[in-house]
């Protein structure tokens, strides 16, 4: 449901595979194709057309396998794509994966793509209406079966099997973690990065290895996420409209919140 793109490695070689029995064509990495086709029990095939690098497929357009979505899916370059297994064409959903999101943001920052990030899962781990009526309300785990059935119904399912792989779990409760792209508040250090690095150089560290550790951390630091989904901590004095979601944060609102908290404590915010 969240698929928006297909990632390919720009340096790998890709070919069209012609399934002679079904008269269908599939785009795959040349090295991975034999194993992938064997997994799908496809034996009667041939390579068609010329070989192309992943870079040559950049921004090529495909359609989402579920026709009801009527969604154009673009091909993006991604160095995270490997030859370990699969087809060399990786499902990419910026709303539900760090690599996926960073690959898309690179294209957005370069002005090559500008699309809304789709995230059809709510904060309780259930599919939203954006996923379609046949999935709405189901947990992400409950949605697996209907999703596979929908692919089969569309004639887009070549094969299926279970895989054992590592998966992120919460370090506290040990439950599996669902990745979601959500709006957060970030602090940028770009305006004072050089000053901070200069201060590190002017500081004597004991032990001396502390210099390189702190210097490298500041040098490579990206925007810092300062917001948390917690009921405790220091609140961010931003006010949101329940209707449109727009926010208001000005020197005046910050000063007003400050005065109230000074008088009543942080519980006043709650």
Regions found by a protein language model. Give the residues of each.
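Carboxylate/His-rich catalytic cores and anion/metal-binding grooves
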Residues: 11-64, 257, 266
């Amino acid at each position: 449901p969240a698929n928006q793109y297909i990632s390919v490695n720009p340096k790998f070689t890709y070919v069209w595979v012609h399934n002679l029995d079904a008269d269908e064509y599939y785009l795959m990495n040349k090295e991975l194709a034999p194993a992938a086709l064997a997994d799908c029990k496809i034996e009667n095939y041939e390579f068609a057309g010329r070989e192309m690098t992943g870079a040559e497929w950049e921004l090529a357009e495909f359609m989402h396998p579920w026709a009801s979505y009527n969604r154009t899916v673009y091909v993006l370059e991604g160095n995270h794509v490997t030859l370990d297994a699969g087809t060399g064409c990786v499902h990419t959903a910026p709303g539900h994966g760090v690599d996926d999101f960073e690959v898309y943001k690179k294209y957005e920052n370069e002005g090559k793509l500008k699309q809304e990030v789709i995230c059809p899962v709510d904060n309780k781990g259930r599919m939203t209406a954006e996923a379609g009526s046949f999935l709405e309300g189901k947990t992400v785990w409950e949605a697996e079966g209907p999703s596979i059935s929908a692919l089969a119904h569309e004639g887009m399912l070549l094969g299926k099997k279970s895989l054992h792989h590592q998966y992120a779990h919460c370090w506290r409760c040990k439950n599996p973690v669902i990745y979601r792209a959500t709006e957060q508040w970030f602090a940028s250090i770009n305006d004072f990065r050089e000053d901070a690095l200069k201060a590190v150089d002017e500081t004597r560290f004991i032990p001396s290895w502390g210099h390189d550790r702190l210097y490298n951390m500041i040098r490579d630091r990206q925007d810092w996420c300062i917001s948390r989904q917690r009921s405790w901590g220091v609140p961010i004095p931003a006010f949101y409209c329940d209707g449109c979601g727009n926010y208001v944060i000005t020197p005046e609102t910050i000063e007003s919140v400050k005065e109230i908290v000074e008088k009543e404590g942080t519980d006043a915010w709650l």
